[in-house]
């Protein structure tokens, strides 16, 4: 199974790239973690946010291979504990499809992305910086994988 992280934003600080790549490299070949970056729309004083969201959404959906299971990372989504995430990852694996996780820009995800998602996952009720979310998601997925594979990374 491949897990594709589709995220708005292309110029991340070095610590974000380093953190994401650290967890990405830990995954085994049969469960690859891939990052697809979508250019953020230009936001200015008089920017048309609805139009920016629509364009970002179109680019995100175009980046997802047909047949992928789509999960939005969004505030009204479901909060998962680490064991619940591990269980969800097992379900995705049994489903036999690759998974695309969507991380929106500063204003979130477009309505089209939310509609296309079969599931919605909420990391926190807190507002998190979008660059940090990439690292948190990568670590959380790796921790879920480690539980499912009896790897000593996760401890109760």
Swiss-Prot record:
Protein keywords: Cytoplasm, Methyltransferase, rRNA processing, S-adenosyl-L-methionine, Transferase
Binding, S-adenosyl-L-methionine: 73, 104, 123-128
Catalytic activities: pseudouridine(1915) in 23S rRNA + S-adenosyl-L-methionine = N(3)-methylpseudouridine(1915) in 23S rRNA + S-adenosyl-L-homocysteine + H(+)
Top-rank EC class of the record's enzyme: transferase
Enzyme nomenclature, EC number: 2.1.1.177
Classification via InterPro entries: Alpha/beta_knot_MTases (IPR029028), RlmH-like (IPR003742), tRNA_m1G_MTases_N (IPR029026)
A GO term for molecular function: rRNA (pseudouridine-N3-)-methyltransferase activity
Keyword Ion transport: no
Gene Ontology CC entries for this record: cytoplasm
Entry annotated with the keyword Transferase: yes
Cell compartment(s), UniProt: Cytoplasm
Pfam families: SPOUT_MTase
Gene3D superfamilies: 3.40.1280.10
Function statement: Specifically methylates the pseudouridine at position 1915 (m3Psi1915) in 23S rRNA.
HAMAP family: 23SrRNA_methyltr_H (MF_00658)
Family, similarity comment: Belongs to the RNA methyltransferase RlmH family.
Oligomer and partners: Homodimer.
Protein name: Ribosomal RNA large subunit methyltransferase H
